[in-house]
Amino acid sequence: LGAVLVVHELAREYEVKKLNAKLDAKGVVQNDEGLYSSVQLFLPEEIYVASGVTIELYNNQISSLGTRIEDYNVKWTCAVGKNMQRKFSITGTDDLEGDYPLIFTIFDDNGAQVATASTTLKIVEDLPEEKKSFSLLTIGDSLSCNTATYERLNELTDNKIIYMGTRGVGGSLTEARRGFSAANYLTDAPYTMEEPHEKVQPFYNEKTGSFDWKYYTEKTGFHPDAVELFLGTNGLAEDPTENGDNIVAIVKDIHETDPTLPIYLVHTIYPANQDGIGSWNNKGQALYGDRYKYDEDQKVFHLMTYLEETLKDENYLYFVPASICHDSANNFDTEEVPVNPHSDEMMEVPTDAVHPGRAGYEQIADCLYSVICG
């Protein structure tokens, strides 16, 4: 009887293995609960590329598979640009201005199509000189607190942007606060991470008990030509609803007062690799010690798709696809560490899980500027 049971169990395992192989061939992946779901791809309806700027789309960042997409075969199809191993790359030029269909396809090892997504690649002219002078107010978190973003925007606009805000980043004014989430901007949250300290952040109106754009503009006298809204990293969760709805609430409040004010909503970026996530610390205390790269990528992917769906009918709102156009595999600063405590062999490990190096902020600026040009 024991031998029969063993043979039966081996046969069952073989059938399960065959079933899993079929599911893999169809692009079906197993989640943590042991259930099966289809591969999800996301490309916005349009990708803007300003003349003189290079924009790249990264395979693992447009898919719910994350880095697991490396187990599949992928292809970009377009009349322009470069179909590369891990990305699609396109440099805008005056000669290439126009619209181009761009298709991304995933295949299994048998050559069967698993999933596909498409967008329109729009190569647009650089802003004319008279349009490079405009005022911009950035509402954000620590990802908007790096001078490299503003320096790159200044380079692209010949130093003509007027930055507005009650706080400063280098020589640029902003409303960026380290550690802040959209939820903080909806409440009477204080800000004490850096000088000057604030008892209550300036968008909060005590009378309405929430974020109030009209109150803010009347109090500060700032009336920008455009708003950049770059939030999402703080507050990321498996369920994007709460974080996403808080961002949506800010958009809706601004447009209730200024319905034609352009808002550039920047999708937050993917984190560093697992070494960066696992080793990021403050004086030896792990900051992301319990987090896993695949799970964090899922949170970013689903927040991006939630916002796109929820705000798809919002006028004068322009999504900036930094999440899929930022090279999260290479943009984080690294340091050399031994591969183990007793080895002379060294390896590169990211020094931060969330905040990229200068190249990352410049890539985000290129993406924002291209959308503005569009």
Question: Where are the regions that the model predicts?
Answer:
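Gram-positive cell-envelope targeting signals
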Residues: 1-22, 26
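Histidine-centered active-site loop/cap adjacent to the catalytic His
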Residues: 339-374
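Surface-exposed intrinsically disordered loops and tails
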Residues: 174-211, 276-294, 320, 326-351
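Beta-strand-enriched, solvent-exposed domains that form extended recognition/catalytic surfaces
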Residues: 21, 25-130
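Low-complexity, Pro/Ser/Thr- and charge-rich linker/hinge segments at domain boundaries
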Residues: 123-145, 164-165, 330-333
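Loop/turn elements at helix/coil->beta-strand transitions in domains of secreted/extracellular proteins
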Residues: 132-135, 158-162, 222-228, 257-264, ...
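Substrate-gating cap/lid alpha-helix
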Residues: 261, 272-325, 354, 358-365
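Conserved SGNH/GDSL esterase-like catalytic core that processes O-acyl groups on lipids
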Residues: 137, 143-239
